[in-house]
């Protein structure tokens, strides 16, 4: 699974897909930092109070590495950081706004979902995540678990979020994050949100559903009677 915030959860099984994916990421331009470089990178990306340092935001990987105090080999375009812990105290599980990929290992899908929940407690609620799977059950379970407005399936995360002709997402540069993220909408904000709509209302035949129809299993007549009695006492 992947997130708009650069993080990746990878399954480990008997053939150790984790190492396979790590190797392929390196082929694609990733640089796996050592433990020493990880510590240097941590000091470069966050100040003593845990705030992101502005001089490492939206910067090339080589520039970030130089700021941290190590040199990136030629042809490497993003940094890979192995992480095993999640939480506000573990910065690489949070948003980095840079080509720095925090990578986590899991051994079963249920554990991956638990990790997703924990990561979104750190930050990123309402935004997006992705899953690289053909298992519809896994995709559906992630959709029920992740507090996000968009889930990209087998797609490049940030570009697919913004809409494409092959995924049905409205094209935009502004992604609504719903009440999860303190926004009014959870959609891709696009043309319809900037168009004024005039509602013309005329009287129609009353079609009022009963409380039982409205609330279903949540409807309790006893509570309604209790509320009515309380109103009568106040009157």
Tell what function each PLM region has.
Residues 70-235:
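Conserved C-terminal structural/oligomerization subdomain of aldehyde/semialdehyde dehydrogenase
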Residues 5, 9-124:
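NAD(P)-dependent aldehyde/semialdehyde dehydrogenase
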């Amino acid at each position: 699974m992947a997130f708009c915030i650069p993080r990746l959860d990878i399954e480990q099984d008997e053939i150790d897909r984790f190492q396979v994916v790590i190797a392929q990421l390196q082929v694609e331009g990733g640089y796996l930092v050592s433990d020493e470089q990880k510590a240097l990178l941590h000091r470069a990306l966050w100040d003593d109070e845990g705030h992101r340092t502005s001089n490492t935001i939206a910067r090339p990987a080589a520039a970030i590495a130089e700021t941290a105090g190590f040199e990136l080999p030629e042809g490497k375009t993003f940094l890979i950081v192995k992480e095993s812990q999640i939480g506000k105290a573990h910065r690489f599980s949070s948003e980095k706004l840079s080509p720095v990929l925090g990578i986590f290992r899991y051994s079963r899908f249920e554990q991956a979902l638990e990790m997703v929940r924990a990561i979104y407690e750190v930050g990123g609620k309402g935004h997006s995540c992705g899953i690289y799977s053909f298992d519809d059950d896994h995709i559906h379970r992630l959709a029920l678990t992740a507090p996000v407005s968009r889930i990209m399936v087998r797609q490049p995360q940030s570009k697919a979020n913004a809409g494409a002709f092959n995924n049905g997402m409205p094209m935009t540069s502004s992604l609504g994050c719903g009440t999860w993220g303190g926004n009014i909408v959870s959609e891709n904000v696009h043309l319809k949100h900037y168009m004024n709509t005039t509602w013309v209302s005329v009287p129609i035949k009353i079609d009022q559903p009963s409380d039982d129809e409205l609330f279903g299993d949540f409807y309790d007549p006893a509570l309604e009677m209790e509320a009515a009695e309380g109103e009568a006492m106040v009157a």
